């Protein structure tokens, strides 16, 4: 590979090739705005039931409240994660993960790499797990989670999830303190930076998230997505995959309402419960259909 080993595009390629060697199928990102790679349907449905799975994929993520109008050097409302899920977990999974860092030229000898206990919970999906954050020289770069529950169902067997924070890893690899200065890709004609691609988007999306999104319209969207998700679950032959997409859309709308400070702290819990109730119903129906 003649171009820069460290650029963002190559980082993705290296991880995809490495996890392919670990017998993971490489999936494509979900084409919906979601807050984390965990929301991908491969992870949600793949963790339910006894069937083994080994999968990896990149996922673009959106967290409207994290927008900073393109002015903050390391905080974004849109960013990338690389997700790995393996069920049942491999006994030496931490060592396998550390080898992936070595391929990125991040060695334990030259860096302070720590596994810091950090149990994880996602109330919206009725999911939680035990695990660790991985810190690289004091900065979190990865979340390790052993799922105990998803959709309110006990995970049997447990699934291990590894979530790489790609921007943070790339900033270390390229020795950059500003995410917008990262080299995304390059050839003999041109270097393309992260800022070239995403900084204007951060500015505009932040304006939309905090100032211009129509609150009344967002409330209407939320109710319609919830209504449609319920309807699809209650069909004689439920459309569970489609219903799941509707609750993901409702979840994103909820996050936009949160960014607009349109929901009080007491109301907030009610909105989360509406989504979680449907996520649990989808999980139960999916497990039942798999048993049949």
From Swiss-Prot:
What are the subcellular locations of this protein?
Cytoplasm
Please list the reactions this protein catalyses. Answer: tRNA(Gly) + glycine + ATP = glycyl-tRNA(Gly) + AMP + diphosphate
High-level lineage: Bacteria, Pseudomonadati, Pseudomonadota, Gammaproteobacteria, Enterobacterales
Highest taxon of the lineage: Bacteria
- Give the record's GO CC terms: cytosol
**Could you say which EC number(s) this protein's record lists?**
6.1.1.14
Q: Which GO terms describe its molecular function?
A: ATP binding; glycine-tRNA ligase activity
Membrane-crossing ranges are: none
What Pfam families does its record include? tRNA-synt_2e
| Species for this entry | Buchnera aphidicola subsp. Schizaphis graminum (strain Sg)
Q: Name one GO biological process term.
A: glycyl-tRNA aminoacylation
Summarize subunit and interaction data from the UniProt record for this chain. Answer: Tetramer of two alpha and two beta subunits.
Keywords, alphabetical? Aminoacyl-tRNA synthetase, ATP-binding, Cytoplasm, Ligase, Nucleotide-binding, Protein biosynthesis
Its protein name is: Glycine--tRNA ligase alpha subunit
């Amino acid at each position: 590979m003649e171009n820069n080993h460290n650029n963002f595009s190559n980082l993705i390629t290296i991880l995809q090739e490495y996890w392919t060697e670990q017998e993971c199928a490489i999936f494509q990102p979900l084409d919906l705005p979601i807050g984390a790679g965990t929301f991908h349907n491969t992870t949600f449905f793949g963790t339910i039931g006894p069937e083994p799975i080994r999968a990896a994929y990149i996922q673009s993520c959106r967290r409207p409240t994290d927008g900073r109008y393109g002015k903050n050097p390391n905080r974004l409302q849109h960013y990338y994660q690389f997700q790995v899920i393996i069920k049942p977990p491999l006994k030496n999974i931490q060592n396998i993960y550390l080898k992936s860092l070595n391929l990125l030229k991040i060695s334990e000898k030259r860096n302070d790499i720590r596994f810091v206990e950090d149990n994880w919970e996602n109330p919206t999906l009725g999911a939680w797990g035990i695990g660790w954050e991985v810190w690289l020289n004091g900065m979190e770069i990865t979340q390790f989670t052993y799922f105990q529950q998803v959709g309110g169902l006990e995970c049997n067997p447990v699934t291990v999830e590894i979530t790489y924070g790609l921007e943070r890893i790339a900033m270390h690899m390229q020795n950059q303190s500003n995410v917008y200065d990262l080299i995304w890709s390059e050839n003999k004609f041109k270097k393309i930076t992260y800022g070239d691609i995403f900084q204007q988007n951060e500015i505009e999306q932040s304006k939309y998230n905090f100032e211009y999104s129509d609150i009344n319209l967002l409330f209407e969207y939320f109710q319609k997505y919830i209504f449609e998700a319920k309807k699809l679950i209650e069909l004689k032959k439920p459309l569970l995959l489609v219903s799941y997409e509707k609750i993901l859309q409702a979840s994103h709308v909820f996050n936009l309402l949160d960014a607009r400070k349109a929901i009080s702290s007491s109301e907030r819990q009610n909105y989360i419960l509406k989504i979680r109730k449907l996520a649990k119903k989808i999980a139960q129906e999916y497990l039942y259909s798999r048993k049949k």
